[in-house]
């Protein structure tokens, strides 16, 4: 039944049938927790890895003892950093100890290691004034992966890859003769027995005794041409280091450094965890038949008798007793299974060691050694602590390698299983913390080299840690990561949802990940393990589809980086769903049967139905209720936040839902936000967690409210918290950020309660669009191809009006010829053009500007020529005044206009940090109010997008029986073929809810049914079918059929026509081809491409075609002559040769082809070089807008040259006022073809 639910300050009528049993986690905790881990533990790990650094003789030792982030010395606040273009960071100080072993002297010092970027409370970083997000990366987890291919005869050939976090790979493969080969670090393959010999089993006999007498292994040994350990070592050395003289010692040290040196080979905690999970003997022998008695060597106890089936519990006990090799019977063959000798330490020690906090399995032989040598509890604990790196090795060990070989052999007998690399149990997340840690490690290892060199060179007595450490490599690595890594992205700040989604994004791209070109279909596809972890719907359309995903709503990331999702635990004995909620990783979940969240339960939590629909990996089964292990916590568990905001998602086709999710992120914040009448109930949580709303840090009473700040008197100590609100700030995408208080003086607020609305929020709920009265009706063809017909009311009443703020900056630099100056005194500018410029030369706040208006007056010294006698005299009399300057003022760009809302001035004198060579920096902010207009893109939440085709007067729109006109008409043909029926249900329910005065919550997969909607319509006094008689606004006559009318939530997207429309008459040209540049940003022309040429050819429009391909494009002389002819009113001359044709000829000549162009009389046509053309143009005394170089002013400024932009032509020609006599009509203009 429909029931009221309090969401923030608003009550919604909810249609949810499933009670929320689990709280949704904080939606940006993936960012916050990861960074916190880095500061608390990650940094410590990196320093620990690199400790100690000693010189080559070993008598100087440098150690990092501890570190602190100096939070009291943060230079600027977050807001100041954005204003001043600096990085929000705190100084990192490291305590360093230097020990001289010869003299025994120890020096300790605190060393400053650079400013370390800090994460803001919203989970972002401020880097050089720009807000950035570090996207989490999905990578293949380190571990052992088995696979198989089928050969021509249908035989399975198994292969394996051992992937460390960093270090050499091991790859196993089988050929069709059953010989198993190994590749070490991508080199040529060797029989696997060679690796076994090198690891210690020299003879054939030893190998067979250890691995068991198995056909494949025997075949491999036959193929092997080495017979001893030494031969095997030399063979491996030859493969890895061809061309070097092989010796046994060098081979041993090579293998040791490749695999058994923690600095060169790192499995990481995850790798060790995955190795132990895959190779542990327990899981592999479970459910097999024992071929011999399995005996505990220590006690002599028989754990499993010969011929018995090994149960799961037995298998686990066998493993924890340290038995590492078990013979099992498979089809009358004895197969030996070898584990990697790791055990659960808690099962091997008979006293409590929980204070050691060991959660991983440990290496049994090392543990046995400790237990055999010591008996005292405290001593054993001490020894365990000391030997931690041996008990839980970071690198691979021999036991691991033997276990991988054994697993490879066993696969042929169905012992073990092959892996699916797209399974989320085999893919993990690297979040901010880990990515930063890796970057820091790179910086430190570069620094380590420098430290070692300095230790060798400098005087060992006088040296201090400060002199040894060079922080540059560390600072550079961090700076490079934040500034230019593929995973450090400029935050999408269009609206709160886009911000939130960006922080929850998972990318498979980036360093160490996939590349778009290499990624196949499998990696991109939806996988059963994504359920509740990654959204199957929200992903970009285009080349990145499936490679960039979004975290599901309830998902969390565990300590190993695997994504977990919560389930309710079912007590199988009672057949009851308990209140316990546990988080499962993808491979843990695979062992259970999971029921849906909407499975009906009685009041005791028992299943009502005898048969229950469950998921088992990718299958959907119906099983007796007693077999169910787990149950989903919520129906929206499998989708992401943006997708969970689409009402009636279950009635939409997936590809349209994808578009709906993506387009919500592009919705522009409107002037007056309104929450959707038909929502899903997640809007409040999304807005609160996104970080755009100020929340009360402590409970208390509101004592002061203004547009700019809210003050809350704390309940605990009576102090006052002040919350400053952002007013009309520019977001990263140029939309407007403005916060409005929603509490009143005297209100009591709780901790975490929302105090003010931000952009696109209404009473703390996300409000991306507007509730619009619309109908599915065609109107005079204006609905063709998804176009939308809108009422003038939407324009007049500012329903879809948004504010956009653009920022422009102007720098005054030092040039070779003297400093630039910001001034009101600009040469050749009328007083009228300076009417809004103040005495400093900067525009006043509140001025209305159009394109071409001056924002900041700036003059640059001109290049000097030899002075004449008169000029020297003037210079002597008037001093510097007569020096030549050029106008290089900042003007409003083409096509922009608006009102100046803010001006900021930064100068050297005020102590502002400016980049080198800059003396003064002025920033102007121009705001525009953009009303909805023809050509703007609008969309609903169901992927139903369209462009506005016409704005119709209100009185002409179709109107309802009560006289209310529709606000938007949509094409009914846009619904059936697209299969997004959710929009129709939304319209019906919205129609009923608006009449009843309700706000609705209809959660995804658990929302209102068709009957519910019909009941609401009836309650509101409408037809149960939701259709209404409409009349034509022009004639007043009824339309033939009834029309579906209702309220739809419609968004205005960030694709505004004002940003896209563009026109050019003359402008910059490309340097090589001399054709106009392309694109609005370059002030380019429209490309007349291949197909357009065909069109003109088809019509036989020869002269038009010739003109387009020559004088309107790249006939350099011709275009100037044409200009001259138009000015003089003469006929347009014959076109010349296009520059691109000359370039083609030159390119052919560069290939040593002798190319000549002949005219009708077979005489060669001589081309002029571009330089000669330039002379000719100079004679014409006309310079149309210059080359592409002249548009990139900064490029020239970098070099410090005083240059002359194309706009200031030396003769200062003003095109409009050219006197016709300026063109001498007897110019000798040669034609290129004579």
Swiss-Prot record:
Record-linked Gene3D superfamilies: 2.40.50.100, 2.40.50.150, 3.90.1100.10, DNA-directed RNA polymerase, subunit 2, domain 6, RNA polymerase alpha subunit dimerisation domain, RNA polymerase Rpb2, domain 2
GO biological process, one term: DNA-templated transcription
CDD domains in the record: RNA_pol_B_RPB2
Cleaved signal peptide residues: none
InterPro entries per UniProt: DNA-dir_RNA_pol_bsu_external_1 (IPR019462), DNA-dir_RNA_pol_su2 (IPR015712), DNA-dir_RNAP_su2_dom (IPR007120), DNA-dir_RNAP_su2_hyb_sf (IPR037033), RNA_pol_bsu_bac (IPR010243), RNA_pol_bsu_CS (IPR007121), RNA_pol_bsu_protrusion (IPR007644), RNA_pol_Rpb2_2 (IPR007642)
GO terms of molecular function: DNA binding; DNA-directed RNA polymerase activity; ribonucleoside binding
Record's protein name: DNA-directed RNA polymerase subunit beta
Protein source organism: Clostridium perfringens (strain 13 / Type A)
Gene responsible for this protein: rpoB
């Amino acid at each position: 039944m429909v029931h009221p639910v309090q969401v923030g300050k608003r009550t919604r009528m909810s249609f949810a049938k499933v009670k929320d049993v689990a709280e949704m986690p904080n939606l940006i905790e993936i960012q916050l927790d990861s960074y916190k881990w880095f500061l608390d533990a990650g940094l410590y790990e990196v320093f620990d890895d690199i400790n100690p650094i000693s010189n080559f003789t070993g008598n100087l030792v440098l150690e990092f003892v501890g570190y602190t982030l100096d939070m009291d010395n943060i230079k600027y606040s977050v807001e100041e950093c954005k204003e001043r273009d600096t990085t929000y960071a705190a100084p990192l100080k490291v305590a360093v100890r230097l020990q001289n072993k010869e003299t025994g002297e120890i020096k300790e010092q605190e060393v400053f290691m650079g400013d370390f970027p800090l994460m803001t409370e919203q989970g972002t970083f401020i880097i050089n004034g720009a807000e950035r997000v570090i996207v989490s990366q999905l990578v293949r987890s380190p571990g052992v992966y088995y696979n198989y291919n089928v050969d021509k005869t249908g035989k399975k050939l198994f292969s394996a890859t051992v992937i460390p976090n960093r270090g050499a790979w091991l790859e196993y493969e089988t050929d069709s003769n059953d010989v198993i080969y190994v590749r070490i670090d991508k080199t040529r393959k060797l029989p696997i027995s060679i690796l076994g010999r090198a690891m210690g089993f020299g003879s054939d006999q030893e190998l067979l005794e250890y691995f068991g007498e198995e056909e494949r292994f025997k075949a491999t040994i036959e193929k092997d041409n080495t017979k001893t350990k030494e031969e095997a070592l030399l063979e491996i050395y030859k493969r890895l280091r061809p061309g070097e003289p092989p010796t046994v010692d060098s081979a041993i040290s090579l293998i040791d450094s490749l695999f058994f040196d923690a600095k060169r080979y790192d499995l990481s905690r995850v790798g060790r965890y995955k190795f132990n999970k895959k190779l542990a003997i327990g899981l592999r022998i479970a459910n097999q038949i024992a071929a011999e008695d399995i005996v505990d060597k220590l006690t002599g106890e028989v754990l499993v008798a010969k011929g018995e089936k090994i149960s799961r519990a037995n298998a686990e006990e066998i493993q924890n007793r340290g038995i590492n090799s078990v013979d099992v019977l498979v089809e009358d063959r004895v197969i030996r299974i070898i584990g990697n000798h790791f055990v659960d330490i808690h099962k091997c020690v008979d006293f409590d060691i929980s204070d050691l906090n060991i959660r991983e399995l440990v290496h049994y032989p090392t543990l046995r050694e400790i237990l055999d040598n010591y008996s005292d509890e405290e001593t054993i604990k001490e020894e365990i602590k000391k030997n931690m790196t041996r008990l839980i090795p970071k690198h691979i060990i021999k036991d691991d390698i033997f276990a991988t070989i054994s697993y490879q052999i066993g696969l042929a007998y169905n012992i073990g299983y092959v892996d699916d690399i797209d399974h989320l149990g085999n893919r993990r997340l690297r979040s901010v913390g880990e990515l930063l840690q890796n970057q820091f490690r790179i910086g430190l290892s570069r620094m380590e080299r420098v430290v070692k060199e300095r230790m060798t060179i400098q005087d060992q007595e006088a040296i201090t840690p400060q002199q040894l450490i060079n922080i540059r490599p560390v600072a550079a690595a961090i700076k490079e990561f934040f500034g230019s890594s593929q995973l450090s992205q400029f935050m999408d700040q269009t609206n709160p949802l886009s911000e939130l989604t960006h922080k929850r994004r998972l990318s498979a791209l980036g360093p160490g990940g996939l590349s778009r070109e290499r990624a196949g279909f499998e990696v991109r596809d939806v996988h059963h393990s994504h359920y509740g972890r990654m959204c199957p719907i929200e992903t970009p359309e285009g080349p990145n589809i499936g490679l960039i995903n979004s975290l599901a709503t309830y998902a969390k990331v565990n300590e190993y980086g695997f994504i977990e999702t919560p389930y309710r635990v079912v007590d199988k004995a009672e057949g009851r769903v308990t209140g316990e909620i546990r988080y499962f990783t993808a491979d843990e979940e695979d062992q259970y049967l999971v029921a849906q969240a909407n499975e009906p339960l009685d009041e005791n939590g028992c299943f009502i139905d005898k048969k229950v629909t469950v998921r088992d990996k990718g299958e959907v089964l119906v099983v007796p209720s007693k077999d169910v292990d787990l149950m989903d916590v919520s129906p929206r568990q499998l989708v992401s936040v943006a997708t969970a905001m689409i009402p009636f998602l279950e009635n939409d086709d997936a590809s349209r839902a994808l578009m709906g999710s993506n387009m919500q992120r592009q919705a522009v914040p409107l002037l007056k936000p309104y929450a959707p009448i038909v929502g899903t109930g997640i809007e409040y949580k999304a807005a609160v967690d996104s970080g755009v709303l100020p929340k009360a840090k402590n409970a208390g009473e509101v004592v002061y409210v203004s547009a700019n700040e809210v003050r809350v008197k704390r309940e605990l100590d009576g102090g006052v918290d002040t919350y400053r609100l952002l007013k009309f700030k520019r977001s990263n995408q140029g939309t407007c950020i403005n916060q409005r208080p929603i509490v009143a003086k005297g209100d009591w607020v709780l901790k975490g309660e929302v105090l003010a609305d931000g952009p696109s929020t209404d009473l703390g709920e996300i409000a991306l669009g507007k509730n619009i009265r619309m109908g599915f009706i065609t109107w005079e063809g204006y609905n063709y191809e998804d176009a939308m017909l809108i009422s003038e009311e939407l324009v007049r009443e500012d329903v879809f009006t948004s504010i956009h703020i653009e920022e422009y900056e102007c720098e005054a630099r030092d040039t070779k010829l003297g400093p630039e100056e910001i001034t009101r005194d600009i040469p050749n500018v009328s007083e009228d053009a300076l009417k809004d410029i103040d005495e400093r030369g900067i525009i006043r706040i509140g001025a209305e500007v159009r394109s071409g208006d001056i924002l900041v007056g700036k003059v640059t010294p001109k290049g000097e020529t030899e002075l004449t006698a008169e000029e020297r005299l003037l210079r002597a009399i008037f001093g510097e005044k007569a020096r030549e300057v050029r106008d290089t003022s900042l003007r409003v760009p083409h096509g922009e206009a608006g009102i100046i809302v803010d001006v900021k001035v930064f100068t050297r004198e005020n102590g502002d940090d400016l980049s080198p060579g800059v003396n003064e920096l002025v920033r102007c902010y121009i705001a525009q109010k953009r009303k909805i207009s023809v050509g703007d893109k609008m969309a609903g939440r169901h992927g139903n997008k369209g462009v506005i085709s016409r704005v119709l007067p209100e009185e002409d729109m179709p109107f309802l029986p009560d006289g209310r006109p529709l606000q938007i008409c949509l094409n009914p043909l846009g619904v059936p073929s697209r299969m997004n029926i959710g929009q129709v249900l939304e319209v019906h329910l919205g129609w009923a809810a608006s009449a009843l005065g309700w706000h609705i919550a209809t959660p995804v997969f658990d929302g209102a049914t068709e009957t519910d909607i019909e009941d609401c319509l009836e309650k509101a006094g409408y037809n149960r079918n939701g259709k209404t008689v409409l009349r034509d606004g022009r004639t007043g006559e009824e339309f033939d059929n009834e029309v579906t009318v209702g309220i739809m939530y419609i968004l205005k997207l960030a694709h505004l026509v004002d940003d896209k429309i563009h026109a050019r008459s003359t402008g910059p040209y490309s340097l090589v081809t001399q054709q106009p540049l392309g694109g609005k940003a370059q002030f380019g022309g429209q490309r007349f491409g291949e197909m357009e040429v065909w069109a003109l050819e088809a019509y036989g429009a020869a002269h038009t075609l010739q003109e387009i391909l020559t004088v309107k494009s790249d006939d350099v002389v011709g275009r100037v002559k044409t200009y001259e002819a138009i000015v003089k009113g003469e006929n347009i001359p014959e076109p010349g040769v296009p520059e691109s044709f000359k370039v083609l000829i030159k390119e052919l000549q560069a290939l040593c082809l002798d190319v000549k162009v002949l005219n009708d009389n077979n005489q060669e046509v001589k081309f002029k070089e571009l330089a000669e053309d330039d002379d000719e143009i100079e004679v014409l005394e006309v310079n149309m807008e210059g080359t592409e170089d002249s548009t990139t002013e900064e490029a020239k400024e970098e070099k410090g040259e005083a240059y002359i932009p194309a706009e200031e032509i030396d003769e200062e020609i003003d095109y409009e006022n050219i006197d016709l006599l300026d063109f001498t009509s007897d110019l000798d203009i040669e034609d290129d073809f004579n």
